[in-house]
A protein has these predicted regions:
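Conserved binding/catalytic microenvironments
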Residues: 101, 105-111, 115-203
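Short alpha-helical DNA-recognition segment
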Residues: 15-32
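Short, charged recognition helix plus adjacent turn
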Residues: 63-89
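DNA major-groove recognition helix of helix-turn-helix/homeodomain DNA-binding modules
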Residues: 44-59
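Alpha-helical residues within helix-turn-helix
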Residues: 9, 19-20, 48
Length: 203
């Protein structure tokens, strides 16, 4: 579903007319085009429309995704479940998908996701024979986490997914880094909860 169609559904559910929502924000004709999927919208206008609907972006995207977690959250949830259930086949499928995304989009975070899955696979797959690869991948992930200037939700989840595999000294250093570099998000509940989980698991 396109974003405009999701907005229209929410607007109608709240009993707000096109004219009422568009008032002092944009023209009725523009809002109508956006809702039909015939026009894009700027972030600033979208923010104003959501504020009028008394809704934030997280809530809007949750509805847009058919009341399912977003792709990032879904990835960590699925990867963690496959690891805990020792589902090697699922881990391999996820890794293949992530690697294809990395090749297609050249976005480095897909690479780190693949490394995380490779680490999980090396632990649960009894036939896994590549010596030293798990340690090498963990080092690559650690290097990334130390290098990045600001930790957001992604970095915290990536670290949470690997911290139990790290040496105690490394965990202490990275947990301190996580706390310091994510401090600006302390009032954002989603990230704040992740910070608390990291600190709790460090103890």
């Amino acid at each position: 579903m396109e974003y405009g169609k999701t907005l229209r559904m929410i607007r109608q559910q709240k009993g707000i007319t096109l004219k009422e929502l568009a008032n002092n924000i944009c023209s009725v004709s523009f809002l109508s085009k956006f809702e039909r999927g015939d026009s894009d919208i700027t972030l600033s206008l979208m923010t104003k429309l959501l504020e009028k609907l008394m809704m934030n972006f997280d809530e809007f995207l949750f509805i847009h995704n058919d009341y399912q977690p977003d792709q990032l959250e879904q990835f960590f949830k699925t990867a963690g479940a496959a690891y805990l259930s020792r589902d090697v086949k699922k881990l391999k499928q996820l890794k293949e998908t992530v690697l294809n995304n990395w090749k297609q989009y050249s976005v480095e975070t897909y690479h780190y996701n693949a490394l995380l899955l490779e680490i999980y696979e090396s632990i649960v797959d009894t036939t896994y024979t590549t010596d030293g690869l798990k340690e090498y991948n963990i080092q690559l992930l650690s290097d990334y986490l130390f290098r990045v200037e600001v930790w957001g939700y992604y970095e915290l989840k990536l670290y949470s997914g690997t911290m139990l595999l790290l040496e105690p000294d490394m965990v202490i250093m990275l947990s301190r880094t996580a706390y310091e570099k994510s401090a600006r998000f302390k009032d954002y509940k989603k990230v704040s909860d992740s910070i608390i989980a990291v600190l709790f698991n460090t103890v």
